[in-house]
Amino acid sequence: MKKNMNNRMVAKRKELLFCILMVLLPTIQFILFYIVTNVNSFFLAFKRHEYGMFEWDGIGRFVEVFNDLFKETINSNMVKEAMKNSFIVYFVGLVASLVFTLLFAYYIHKNYFGGKVFKVLLFLPNILSMLTLCFLFKFFVNRAVPEVFMDLFRKDIGIPMIDGAPTEYGLLMFAFIFFGLGTQLILYLGAMSGISDSIIEASELDGVSSIQQLWYIVIPMIFPTIKTFLVCGLAGIFTNQFNLMNFYGLGRDNDVTIGYYFYKLTTEGKANYPYIAAFGLMISAVLIPVTLIINKLLEKVEKEFV
């Protein structure tokens, strides 16, 4: 009896040690790369950079950000344009990726014709780095597409399609949406695979069409996954750089987003760090309550919808 108790104690200690080791590395990473980094950013927001040093400045950087957002300053046009573009990229990307990913995931889940081909094509961008993908995409639309038009239609497009052409913004948006489909596709497919076959078979026996099955059965049952994407996506509104860095480096002045604008500021020197930190805190002060409210609303929708 005593021996069995000792064995249980040893087993529990080993299990506890295993759990500690499993969470140790992620915990250290969270402390170093989130807490420490953000604590430093918090204090930077109340400082200014002069003569190679950071000095206490109170709310000076916050006033500067407020003026750039709501008044006419040297940087106000760029900041307002970046804010507008960030919202456009977020909402267009959200709607397009949600609709297309759900439809493609459902198509593949139903094992319709060519489903496996779509699965490979949509997940392929996740295998390569984003920089490589952008380089290949830019080469394709600037070089390959004009040559195809010339061979097939004897029509010279004239200018590169993604470098100053009227098609540039549309192609950037297409690339942004397409490159982001793979991860969502896999997660939606995983959620759909958890739906009981008996439910699907019962709906088919009742004469439910594929569209009705998607709307009334599949979407409600994978709604927690959809909700996760919707809530987490809010955090990326002002960090998304729209792949502009990968396509143009630091030389882009049009269609910039807040994420790209921040990155350009960091490369210009430490003097911009307090401004970026203050801007980030103001964004967080708005996004945190908005995210919590939307999460609560989606939870209510989930209870009624599911």
Cite the ranges covered by each PLM segment.
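Short, Lys/Arg-rich, polar N-terminal cytosolic tail immediately upstream
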Residues: 1-13
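A structural signal for multi-pass alpha-helical bundles of membrane permease subunits
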Residues: 10-306
